[in-house]
């Protein structure tokens, strides 16, 4: 089983991204379940969403406390939320940020990092900092667990139409093309 935890802010579409990723996994013949976490959060408040994917039926519908991968769609969130809490050793981070890898403080559990200046690109495409579809493209390239084509089909099957569909398709493709993927070698303690 592969578990993903999405971190974002209300209104950025992290819950929608989790659902779209689940649809793409089903498109590939896998089992997937998206688990949104709703409370009384308002637009701009930190939110979290969860996704499990597997080759077998998934019966566990709880929150994810030890993710294999963390997708953070908001570059400011790491200042106020411990997004790395419980992350498994050898984990993957897909982060929206304009900072290079050398400027990020990453815990030892992270071994693969996908960095994307998603806010800049979102402002070019949408004229708003909505980064969710960009980060799905970045997730696909960074992890390799889902194909870009399956994400495109899931996007086509979503509620987006006309200009919104075209913009989100562009965002998905640019996220995939422009993410910088880094593999971090960690030395074992002596």
Swiss-Prot record:
pH dependency: Optimum pH is 8 when measured with benzyl viologen. Half-maximal activities are obtained at pH 9 and pH 6.8.
InterPro entries: Oxidoreductase_gamma_subunit, PadE, PorC_KorC, Pyrv/ketoisovalerate_OxRed_cat, Pyrv_flavodox_OxRed_cen
Enzyme class: oxidoreductase
Activity regulation summary: Activated by magnesium ions and thiamine diphosphate.
Record keywords, A-Z: NAD, Oxidoreductase
Protein name: NADH-dependent phenylglyoxylate dehydrogenase subunit gamma
Catalysed reaction, written as an equation: phenylglyoxylate + NAD(+) + CoA = benzoyl-CoA + CO2 + NADH
EC number: 1.2.1.58
GO process annotations (BP): L-phenylalanine metabolic process
Keyword DNA-binding: no
Induction cue: Induced anaerobically by phenylalanine, phenylacetate or phenylglyoxylate.
Oligomeric and partner information: Dimer of heteropentamers composed of an alpha (PadG), a beta (PadI), a gamma (PadE), a delta (PadF) and an epsilon (PadH) subunit.
UniProt superkingdom: Bacteria
Short name of one Pfam family: POR
PANTHER family, sorted: PYRUVATE SYNTHASE SUBUNIT PORC (PTHR43366:SF1)
Protein's job: Involved in the anaerobic metabolism of phenylalanine and phenylacetate. Catalyzes the oxidative decarboxylation of phenylglyoxylate to benzoyl-CoA and CO(2). It can also react slowly with 2-oxo-3-methylbutanoate and use different electron acceptors such as benzyl viologen, methyl viologen, FAD or FMN, but NAD seems to be the physiological electron acceptor. Also catalyzes an isotope exchange between CO(2) and the carboxyl group which proves partial or complete reversibility of the oxidative decarboxylation reaction.
GO MF entries: NAD binding; oxidoreductase activity, acting on the aldehyde or oxo group of donors, iron-sulfur protein as acceptor; phenylglyoxylate dehydrogenase (acylating) activity
């Amino acid at each position: 089983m592969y578990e993903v935890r999405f971190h974002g802010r209300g209104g950025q579409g992290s819950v929608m991204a989790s659902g779209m990723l689940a649809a793409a996994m089903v498109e590939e013949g896998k089992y997937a379940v998206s688990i949104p976490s709703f409370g009384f959060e308002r637009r701009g408040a930190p939110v979290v969403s969860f996704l499990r994917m597997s080759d077998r039926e998934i019966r566990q519908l709880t929150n994810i406390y030890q993710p294999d991968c963390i997708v953070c769609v908001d570059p400011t969130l790491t200042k106020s939320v411990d997004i790395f809490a419980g992350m498994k050793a050898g984990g993957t981070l897909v982060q929206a940020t304009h900072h290079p890898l050398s400027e990020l403080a990453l815990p030892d559990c992270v071994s693969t990092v996908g960095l994307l200046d998603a806010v800049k690109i979102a402002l070019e495409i949408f004229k708003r900092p909505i980064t969710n579809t960009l980060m799905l493209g970045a997730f696909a390239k960074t992890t390799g667990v889902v194909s870009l084509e399956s994400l495109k089909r899931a996007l086509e099957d979503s509620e987006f139409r006309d200009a919104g569909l075209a913009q989100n398709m562009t965002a998905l493709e640019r996220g995939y093309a422009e993410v910088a993927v880094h593999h971090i070698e960690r030395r074992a303690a002596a």
